[in-house]
Amino acid sequence: MSTHPTSFADWQVYPSKLDPIHVAWLKSAKKSKTAFAVADIEGVEISHKKFLTGVLLFSKKIEAYSPEQNIGLLLPSSGGGAIASIAILSLGKTLVNLNFTAGKKALSSAAKQAEVKHIYTSRKFLDKMFERGMDLESYFPDSKLLMLEDIREEISTLSRIVTLLKAILLPASMIQKSYFKEVSMNDTAAILFSSGSEGSPKGVELTHMNIAANAKQAAIELEAADSDVIMSTLPTFHAFGFAITTLMPLSEGIPIVCHADPKDVSTISSGIQKYSGTILVGTPTFLRMYTISKKVTYESMQSLRLVVAGAEKLRSEVRDGFEKKFKMPVYEGYGTTETSPGASVNLPDI
C-alpha cells in the first residue's frame, strides 16, 4: 500500500512532515548507491561523496564572504551550480537565481530588488557569455561578483581531504548539526524572477515547504526512482529547471546529467545515449529542435521512458512530430513560478 498522500486533504498536511530540500538531499546522498550524483555531458562525473564534500567546503566560504541573507547565483545548469545551490540553502540563506538571458536592465533590477550584495558565478561562464555579446560583469553595479574558480583555488589540499573524510565517515545527522543552519519550512528558500518582458521583473518568493512539497509531488507523479537518470538541461533561473530537474532528483538520490545550453540538442541527445537518460523535461520550443535536427537520431533517444513539456503550450505539431520521429509520446506539464512550479501533468495510461 502506498504511504504517499492520495487526496487534496492529505496534501494539506503532508508537506509539513517533509524535510527541507537540502536536508532531504543530505539523507539521500548518504544512502545513495548510484554511480554518480551529477555528471556533465562532456564526461565529468561527481560522486555523492565528492558532491557532499563540495557543499560543505563551499558553504564555509559563503559564510565567510556573505553574511547577508540573500545570495545571488549566476550560473547555467552545471555541477558547480547544483553544489552552490545546495550550499546556499543549507546555510538557511535565500537563493536568488538570476536570469542571465533577461538583459542588462532586467538583471540589474532583479539584483537590486532582492538586495543581492554578492553573486557567485564562474569566470569560464562569463567568458562564454561575453563571446555572445553579453558583458554580464557590467550588469551589476551594486553587487560584487565572486568566481567559483577563485574560491576553489583558496581551498587547501588538507581542507579537501579532511572534509572528504567527514563526508564519508560522519552520519547525516551529525553533518546536519555541524554544518546546516536550522530553518522553518515557512522561511523563504529562493527568489525566482520573471523575465521582465512585461515590465520590470517580478520576484517570486518560494518557501522551503513550497519547494519540498512540489519536488515530492513531481517525484511521486513521475514515479521517479534511483534507477532513473534525469537530463538537467533547463537553467536553474527557470522554475522547472530549478525545482524539477535539479532539486527534485538531488533530494531523491537520482543522478542528473547537466548541460548548459538547452538548445544544443545534438550534444544532449548524445548525453542521453551515453548515460542512458530516462527523463527529459523541456519547453516545446526546445523539444521541437529534437524533431528537426538531423543529428538527433531515433537510436540516441531510446533510453528515455518519459518526456515532459512545460513552460509554454504544447502545440500538436510538436507533440506529433516528436512521437513520429522517436516513437514516444510527450506529456504536458502546467505550472507557474508561483506554484513552485508544477501544478499538473498528464501521465501515461495505466
Segments and roles (model prediction):
Residues 51-58, 171-174, 185, 204-225, ...:
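Conserved structural elements of the adenylate-forming
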Residues 160-169, 277-282, 291-350:
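Gly/Ser/Thr-rich phosphate-binding loop
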